[in-house]
Amino acid sequence: MKFAVFSCTLYSAGFFNVYNSALNSGAQFAVHLGDYIYEYGSDPSKFGNASTPDTAVTAVSLGRVVTPANDIVSLSDYRTRYAQYRQDADLQALHAKMPWITIWDDHEFANNAYVDGAQNHDATTQGSWAARKAVAAQAYHEWMPIRTPDTSNLLKIYRKFDFGTLFSLHMLDTRIEGRTKQVYGYFGDPFDAKVQPYNWADYAAGLTPVNGVYPDAANKMLSTTQFNWLTGNIAASSTTWQIVGNQDIMAKLWYPASVVAAFAQGQAAFTTAVTAYLSGPRTETKIPINMDSWDG
């Protein structure tokens, strides 16, 4: 059994060459782990659109300017963005070639989404999060090749696929259905220190125990219902392998502090810092770099 896995397909950042490569890979089906679309508009300050001092590659020069121009919020906006993505010839070809199994991440809604909100949602200008979340989910079910698990609740998307006795594929929703607000300590929107300085105070507050207890010890990525569903399915399964399809890295991801600091100074400084770290003793402070991962 062979399948192709995709995630984080940002239209304005480049072409979907990997979809073309998968056409003749021998894959029998495709799995997309989320961020099939991105909600950002065409504002040059938004991720994926702006020129960088190192490459000067822009969405304009690539002919990949998104529509509508605003961050997508309404049902019409989300439908329009899916329609634009589907104009990509490689994506069209892969959908025609093989079946897909998909799950959403945050950008099908808004950056760093959770149950009650998102980093890239402003209720004062974009209305209620619940309303935006509902129309985003509706557009997803309209445009994606998915057998909707529960037509009465479009936000319930986790499900299981059994491939004979070989393996079970458990597709989770670690974003919308049960996630609490994550620790915010990152470079801007998303990891780009040229856009917004690192929020060290917020970051440190989320990592500093008070009387031996971490402030966010009660945070979770799955609801109790979904967790029980997953563990129950795994316990009852008779397949050889259990595979979890989810949106986030299931490992610790640490960066040297000097490398993180150099990132804000451009490619040359970043490369120098990486080289120095790799050639020197491994003694400096490291920090976790992706605070919405399953990194323990």
List each model region and its residues.
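Metal-dependent phosphoester/phosphodiester hydrolase catalytic core
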Residues: 1-296
